Amino acid sequence: MSKASKEALLERALNKITKSQTNTNVAEAHEEIESNYAYINEKQLKRLVELHDTEFKDKCVVPLQRLYYKYSDTVLCDGDLQNWAELIDRDIRVLETTLAKVRDNQSGG
């Protein structure tokens, strides 16, 4: 067999391998791994979001709802917007007085 025919035979074999449209066992295994990886990531992401949402709800939303339900009836019984404003004004004054006392204690003590 001549050198040219060997090169042509080698060229055909390489073209057959590189331009093949059929998957090899390795390629099929690789595709399966990638699809499993995507599936696992999707499941893990969903679970992570659920955990985050649950934790956020338990630590933030539920306590605020409890406070709202505990005090909203009391405030609503007091009446209109004027009463609300008076209650808020009173609370702000209490906070201002408390801050002033804290500052006085820090500067004096």
UniProtKB/Swiss-Prot annotation:
Keywords: Endosome, Transport. Its main location: other. Disulfide bonds: none annotated. Signal peptide: none annotated. GO terms for cellular component: endosome. It is found in: Endosome. Component of the biogenesis of lysosome-related organelles complex-1 (BLOC-1). Component of the biogenesis of lysosome-related organelles complex-1 (BLOC-1), a complex involved in endosomal cargo sorting. Belongs to the BLOC1S1 family. This is Biogenesis of lysosome-related organelles complex 1 subunit BLS1. The gene is BLS1.
